[in-house]
Amino acid sequence: MTAKRIDGKAFAAGVRARVAEEVARLKEGHGIVPGLAVVLVGEDPASQVYVGAKGKQTVEVGMASFEHRLPAGTSEAELLALIDRLNHDPAVHGILVQLPLPAHLNADLVINALDPAKDVDGFHISNVGRLGTGQKSMVPCTPLGCLMMLRDHLGALSGLNAVVVGRSNIVGKPMAQLLLGESCTVTIAHSRTRDLAAVCRGADILVAAVGRPEMITGDFVKPGATVIDVGINRIERDGKTKLVGDVDYASAAEVAGAITPVPGGVGPMTIACLLANTLTACCRANGLPEPQGLTA
């Protein structure tokens, strides 16, 4: 068996196209332009590239992009004052604070200063709690992207056994909550789970988000299972730096029914879902129906 390759890059392009259509409808029908504000503190090169990509794609779908690039020495009071202004700015429907923040800033304090309705990363404690209790919330972008791809590939997920390897607040825990919301039977595993391979082999859906390069090999995979690889790891191989996931693609693809590659799998969905969340936040703020299929 050779697994179907789930093309996250193509799927993300489809999500962005759908968002662009809905943005155009908002402009034509209601005179509303969704706005996304991104806040970057410091000069971290990877964060600068990521913020630039977010701004570019925001504009491409017809939204307003507001970038706030602050020096690394910005005080907590200054950052919180900016967030307060953005919270009260009617042109801004989504706010994202690029992480990680410099060490002198309290990330939890900053994230929880956001208006939960504008927290398009879904990290505010209110959104975390609402997701956990099955209420309408802003859903973290990476798990939302995984769910979209699973729905597209498998259709109804009800009754399937799902194993999420990883328990982070950003991916593992919200992914498990989303799968519970789809009526899956969910197991959260991690690096200390006893006989992890046996646990994973019981999964119809296997989500790897443990942060260990190529940890999940083919003998962890149930024949025909759908494998979603959230990991992004840089390793040295043959004198070159290579990007790999948490799944050993070559061996897992021989067993799985479908699998996401790294790169080109889950990664492109993160920004696409950020745009989808901004659209959702805009619709909610204006009392308009939310577009179907772009949120949980």
Curated annotation (Swiss-Prot):
Pathway: One-carbon metabolism; tetrahydrofolate interconversion
Example of a GO cellular component annotation carried by this entry: cytosol
Record SUPFAM superfamilies: Aminoacid dehydrogenase-like, N-terminal domain (SSF53223), NAD(P)-binding Rossmann-fold domains (SSF51735)
Keyword NADP tagged: yes
Presence of the UniProt keyword Ribonucleoprotein in the record: no
Pfam families the UniProt entry points to: THF_DHG_CYH (PF00763), THF_DHG_CYH_C (PF02882)
PROSITE patterns referenced in this protein's UniProt entry, alphabetically: THF_DHG_CYH_1, THF_DHG_CYH_2
E.C. designation(s): 1.5.1.5, 3.5.4.9
Any GO MF annotation of the entry: methenyltetrahydrofolate cyclohydrolase activity
Reactions mediated catalytically: (6R)-5,10-methylene-5,6,7,8-tetrahydrofolate + NADP(+) = (6R)-5,10-methenyltetrahydrofolate + NADPH; (6R)-5,10-methenyltetrahydrofolate + H2O = (6R)-10-formyltetrahydrofolate + H(+)
Residues the record lists as binding NADP(+): G166, R167, S168, S191, I232
One Gene Ontology biological process: methionine biosynthetic process
The entry's keywords: Amino-acid biosynthesis, Histidine biosynthesis, Hydrolase, Methionine biosynthesis, Multifunctional enzyme, NADP, One-carbon metabolism, Oxidoreductase, Purine biosynthesis
HAMAP family: THF_DHG_CYH (MF_01576)
Quaternary structure and partners: Homodimer.
Entry function: Catalyzes the oxidation of 5,10-methylenetetrahydrofolate to 5,10-methenyltetrahydrofolate and then the hydrolysis of 5,10-methenyltetrahydrofolate to 10-formyltetrahydrofolate.
Family per record: Belongs to the tetrahydrofolate dehydrogenase/cyclohydrolase family.
Protein name per its UniProtKB record: Bifunctional protein FolD
The organism of origin for this protein: Cereibacter sphaeroides (strain ATCC 17023 / DSM 158 / JCM 6121 / CCUG 31486 / LMG 2827 / NBRC 12203 / NCIMB 8253 / ATH 2.4.1.)
